């Protein structure tokens, strides 16, 4: 699920799925409908040209990096020819104006660093931040409340709610009032 990052608002809220049969990275626009979510009509975000469908390309996984770029894993297992050759590639998908990714400076020690990590497009960075924020308890409540009230991206805005609900009675009361 692409929430925020370098690819811009056009992909915000897009669910991404690797389709190994079609050899494409599929994109969906989930929309709420009654008590469920409809995935919408899928479209190929990345795929082979029709004339290249027999090429060795098999998208298996997609993740969002710390810079908001997509990292697409292509794994090709040539067991059908009985030579058991394995090959694969990791593709970085980003805008043309982006250079090579820089190693992120993630501060898991300070409250401000953890709140910044909570805003990362990378799920693994956010998960580590959530665990550390919950462990700090009510001491981080003001920073989380400030992020909730100031975030412009709705996906970033809901992240502190998840943490606040785990902080005990104060956080749970705040979240309950939002319902």
Please provide the spans of the model-predicted regions.
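Beta-propeller domains with acidic blade repeats across secreted/periplasmic ectodomains
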Residues: 1-113, 134
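Beta-strand-rich binding/interaction modules
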Residues: 25-28, 126-144
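Structural detector for internal amphipathic alpha-helices that build alpha-solenoid repeat scaffolds
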Residues: 100-105, 123-136, 155-169, 173-178
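Amphipathic alpha-helical scaffolding segments comprising HEAT/armadillo-like alpha-solenoid repeats
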Residues: 106-116, 137-149, 168-179
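Substrate-binding clefts and catalytic carboxylate motifs of secreted carbohydrate-active enzymes
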Residues: 112, 116-117, 121-128
């Amino acid at each position: 699920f692409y929430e925020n990052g370098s690819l811009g608002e056009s992909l915000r809220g897009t669910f991404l799925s690797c389709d190994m049969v079609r050899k494409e990275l599929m994109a969906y626009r989930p929309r709420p409908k009654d008590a469920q979510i409809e995935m919408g009509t899928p479209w190929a975000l990345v795929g082979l040209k029709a004339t290249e469908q027999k090429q060795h390309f098999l998208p298996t996984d997609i993740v969002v990096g710390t810079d908001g770029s997509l990292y697409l894993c292509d794994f090709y297992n040539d067991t059908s020819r009985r030579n058991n050759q394995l090959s694969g590639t990791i593709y970085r998908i980003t805008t043309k104006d982006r250079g090579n990714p820089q190693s992120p400076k993630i501060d898991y020690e300070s409250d401000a660093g953890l709140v910044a990590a909570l805003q990362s497009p990378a799920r693994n960075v956010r998960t580590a931040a959530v665990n550390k924020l919950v462990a700090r308890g009510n001491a981080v409540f003001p920073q989380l409340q400030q992020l909730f009230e100031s975030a412009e991206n709705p996906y970033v805005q809901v992240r502190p709610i998840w943490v606040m609900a785990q902080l005990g009675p104060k956080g749970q009361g705040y979240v309950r009032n939002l319902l």
